[in-house]
Each structure stands twice: as C-alpha cells, then as structure tokens.
C-alpha cells in the first residue's frame, strides 16, 4: 500500500490546533502517512513544514485585508501551485474560509479528494453564501451537532465530528491551583479577558476591555490567556494598565484559569 500524502491548510491558531490533532490521529492509524501544507507551531510540532508562515493569513476585516490584497493573492496562487505540483491523496482545509474556500474554488475542476474541517457559520449570518458551496468539497466536517441538518436543508452533506475543546483537556483545570500559583485570594473575583488571536482584534479590543475593567463597581483580578501570534502585542499593550493583568501563556495554566 502506497504511503498517503495529506495536504492540510490552516490559516489561524485555532485551525492550527485542530490540524495538529488531526495529524496525530492520522499517524496513529497510518504511521506511514506524510503531510504537507500550511500550518502554525502546533502542526510544526507534529512534523509539518509550512509552505509559508501562518501569520500571513491571520487577518481580519477589510482594514487589515485591503493593504495586503496583492500579497494574499500571491499566497493563494503559491498554495494552489504547490497542491497541483505535489498531487496529494487528500486535501484538508481547516476553517479560515476567506482563504481556504478560495483555494478550493481555484482548484476546480479537480479529481482531488477534498475535506473542509469546521463548517462555515452561514447559519449565523449571510446564509445566502451557502449557494456557492456545492462542488467545493467531498466532505464537510462540522463541530456543532445541529450543523449537518442545516446543510442538509441546502442539499449539502455534512458530518458532525465533535468540538475540539472537548478533546483539549480544558475540563481538567484546577481553580484552586491557579489561585495558589498567582497568590489570588479565595474570595477575589477573577475576570477573564479575551482580546482575540489576531493583531487587529487586539488593537481594537484591548482599550475597550481596559476601560470596561475600570468601570466595574467592584475590584477584579484580570486574567488574559495569551494566543501565540499576538502574545508580544498583548504583553506590550497591557504593561501600562493600572490593574496589572495576569498573563497566561501555557496550556495547563489556561485550563486552570478557566476552571
């Protein structure tokens, strides 16, 4: 049996985490499988060499996308050319529909087996986008249990595969350990501050979140779980806060904070 080549594309940190778990799971069943594509640090730990840095795709909103539109088009062409040159057995695109669905569209027509992991949330907004999806993929893998029925109403087959947060160990955290580690009193109120994983989100949301904390009638202990791509920005931007937040970078620490 020929060793399969699986091409994966993840455009942001959440997709990178999903891609890493997918590579690990595939290797458990097919140790001979090889992988190529685009991913971040988590997928790199599983042995993937990314075609280009994932941060090039972690953009949000017109104000961030427009200045880099020509760069993004070049990355799209580079990705499509790499897929066509490698001729993988399967292509798995993970979330980031602004980029991944354009890759799938650019590959048409094709006999390549394609799976899109993390269904576009057209059930939440702009449902009319669903009319553009037929033919883009062979398998649509959903994180939420109601999504297959939604897509079935639009004559699109989809499969519920579970949410990655349930596989991440997020339910194993220990709140008492977190308080002890950071010398937080048992009766102190903790406020989790989540400014996002994209640079634009952080620049836009952190000032609002700081002002919100200032307006609270009771004192709180702000805790900020750090996303890798924006860790340096968050550290810099929160350094001058009058109420210094606890910054949590490690996974176990985040699980404890959420507990």
Predicted regions and their residues:
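A general secondary-structure boundary signal
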Residues: 76, 93, 138, 186-187, ...
């Amino acid at each position: 049996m020929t060793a399969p080549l699986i091409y994966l594309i993840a455009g942001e940190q959440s997709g990178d985490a999903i891609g890493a778990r997918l590579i690990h799971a595939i290797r458990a069943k097919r140790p001979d499988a090889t992988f190529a594509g685009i991913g971040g640090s988590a997928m790199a730990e599983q042995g993937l060499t990314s075609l280009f840095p994932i941060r090039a795709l972690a953009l949000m909103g017109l104000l961030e996308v427009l200045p880099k539109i020509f760069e993004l088009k070049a990355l799209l062409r580079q990705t499509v050319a790499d897929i066509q040159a490698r001729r993988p057995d399967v292509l798995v695109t993970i979330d980031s529909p602004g980029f991944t669905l354009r890759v799938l569209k650019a590959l048409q027509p094709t006999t390549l087996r394609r799976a899109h992991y993390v269904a576009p949330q057209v059930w939440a907004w702009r449902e009319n986008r669903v009319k553009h999806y037929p033919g883009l993929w062979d398998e649509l893998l959903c994180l939420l249990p109601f999504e297959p029925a939604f897509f079935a109403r639009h004559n699109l087959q989809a499969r519920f595969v579970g949410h990655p947060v349930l596989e991440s160990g997020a339910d194993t955290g220990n709140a008492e350990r977190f308080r002890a580690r950071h010398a937080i009193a048992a009766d102190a109120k903790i406020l989790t501050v989540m400014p996002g994983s994209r640079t634009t989100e952080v620049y836009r949301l952190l000032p609002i979140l700081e002002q919100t904390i200032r307006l609270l009638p009771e004192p709180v202990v702000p805790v900020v779980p750090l996303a890798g791509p924006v860790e340096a920005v968050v550290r810099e931007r929160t350094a001058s806060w009058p109420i210094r937040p606890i910054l949590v970078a490690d996974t176990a620490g985040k699980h404890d904070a959420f507990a």
